[in-house]
Amino acid sequence: MVRVRLAPSPTGTLHIGTARTAVFNWLYARRQQGSFLLRIEDTDKERSKPEYTQNILEGLRWLGIDWDEEPLIQSEQVQQHRAAIETLLQKGLAYRCYANEAELDAMREAQKASNQAPRYDNRHRNLTPEQEAAFQSEGREAVIRFRIDDNAEIRWNDMVRGAMSWRGADLGGDMVVARRAPADQIGDPLYNLVVVVDDAAMAISHVIRGEDHIANTAKQLLLYEALDLPAPTFAHAPLILNAEGRKLSKRDGVTSINDFRTMGYTAEAIANYMTLLGWSVPEGMEERFTLPEAAAVFSFDRVNKAGARFDWDKLNWLNGQVLHALPAQQLLDDLRPLWAEQGWTLPDDSSWGLELCELLGPSLTLLKEGVEQATPFFKCPDLEDDGVRQLEADGARTAVAQLLQILEAEPWDGKDTDRAKQLLADAAKGAGVKKGVVMKSLRAALLGRLQGPDLITTWCLLARIGEDLPRLQRCLA
C-alpha cells in the first residue's frame, strides 16, 4: 500500500515550497488510493514553536489537504533514534569523533588553501582505545559519525529523474548522526538518521520531496542498509525558482502561504498553481482544476526535472478564474469578514449583498480587491479628477438637475432596472442632452469617477439603500 508523508519543521510558517511538496504527496496518495501522513520534525528545540505547527496544519487544511492518521511528533521518538545509533555503534558502522571545532576549522582552512572540496577527513575513524581514553581524559565530548565508504556506489531509481547514482566519496566524509555529548552518552540525533528511523517506523513507501534533498537521499540509503530497514521509493520534484532562475527564497518577497492569503488569493487557486509548478497537465485537460480533479490523473511521468519558475501572471489569472466562477453566496461569505474589518455592515435586505457580489465578482483578480471595489457602496466617495471634469462638462449639471427633479417627483425604490433605464431616457429628453451625458454624469455622481461596474445595477443597489439622491444633490451644491 502506498504511504507517503509530509515532514515540515515548525520553525516558521507554511512555506510555498513545503506547500507544493504537500500537494504532490497528497495527489499521489489519492491517485494510488494510499495514505497521506504528517510528521512534525520539531527536533530543533530553539526554533521550533507550537504556533508554527498550528500555522502549518491550518495552512494545509485551508489548501484542502487532509491527512489520514494523527501526525507523528518527531521529538517524541528520540528513544528510537538513539536506539538506532546504538545499533550502528555496536555493529562498528558508527564511531565517536572527538575533533573539536578549532581542529575542524583548521582542517577546512587547509582544504580551502589547497583548493580541495570541504569534507571531513575521517581522522577519528579508527581510534585505538588508548587514543579514545586520552581524549576523554582531556574532557572532550564527541559527536557520533556514520562510516561512509568512499568506494560505495549508491544507486536508486527516482520516479522523476530515473536512474540515479552517487559515489560515497562525494558525500563529504563520515556523516555526523548525533550531536556532541559526553563520551558515555549519545547526543541529540540528527536529520538524516532520524528521518530514516521515522520513515521506517511509519512504513513510508514513497518519499516525495524537492531536488535539494538528493544528496540526503544517497546518505539515507546507506543508513537504511546499515540498519537493515526497507528503503522507500524516492521522487525528487524540481525546485521552485524566481524570475531570474534562482531558488525562490524569502529575499524574493512573498513565500509564506499566510502572505498569499493576506494578499487575497484563494485556496483553490494556490493549490491549483502549486500543482502546475513542476507538473504538466495531460493533453485535453484545462490548466484550471481542483485538487480532486488533478488527483484523478496525477503521475510522476508528467513531473518535470527542470526547475519551475514562479509566474505571478499565471497565478493571478488562475485566481481571477476562481473568483469569477464563485457562486455569489460563497464570494459574499469570503468578503463579509474583509468588509467587517472596514467597519461596514450589510443592509437588512438579504439579497443586496448577493447582488453586489454578482456585480463585482467578474472583475476581481484578488479577493482584497473586493474591498476597494465595494468601497463606494458603503461610503460616499470623493470626486476624482475625471469625475470632476465630467460634472463640469457641457450639459452635465442640467442633466443631473433634471434627473433629480424626476426622482423627487416620482420616487423609486431601485428594484426595477427597466424603470432605471426609462428614468435616464426621460432625464436626457428633459435636459435636451444625449443619454450618454446623463449616464456619465450619474456614474461620476455615484462613484466619483467614470470607471466602474455596470451603471444600472450600481444605481439600483445604491437607490435601495437611499444613497443615490444625496450623491446627486452634492453635485449641485
Swiss-Prot record:
The positions annotated for binding ATP are K250
- Which Gene Ontology terms cover its molecular function? ATP binding; glutamate-tRNA ligase activity; tRNA binding; zinc ion binding
Query: Which top-rank group of organisms is this from?
Result: Bacteria
Would I find Aminoacyl-tRNA synthetase among this entry's keywords? yes
User: Which parts of the sequence form the motif 'HIGH' region?
Assistant: 8-18
Q: What does this protein do?
A: Catalyzes the attachment of glutamate to tRNA(Glu) in a two-step reaction: glutamate is first activated by ATP to form Glu-AMP and then transferred to the acceptor end of tRNA(Glu).
Provide the family line. Belongs to the class-I aminoacyl-tRNA synthetase family. Glutamate--tRNA ligase type 1 subfamily.
Q: Which protein are we looking at?
A: Glutamate--tRNA ligase
